[in-house]
Amino acid sequence: MPAYWVARAKVNDPVEYKKYADRVPAILAKYGAKVLTRGGRYQTLEGQEKFNRFVVIEFPTFEQGVACFYSQEYREAAAFRRRNKAGENELVMIEAGESQPAQAR
């Protein structure tokens, strides 16, 4: 069953963030991922407008998406982004389908 990375980012330094973003497609390809949207037009409809870049990436399975995130290559790319203060990201892994809402943690 497909699964998705859903990322929200606040880009602080576009030049440095691009260096990070340019590294990611080759990493994703190793996990069979497909970029569905990456930085296109958006409008905040609810909530605070903290983020200015949105990305949705499809993986063949939930496990492949998690493995990609924890791969050495992606960890190095993310560390570069954080070290250079290029941007702040929030990333969730979501499996396709519908289920009951989770209880509060």
Q: How would you name each of these model-derived features?
A:
Residues 66, 75-93:
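C-terminal structural segments of small proteins and small subunits
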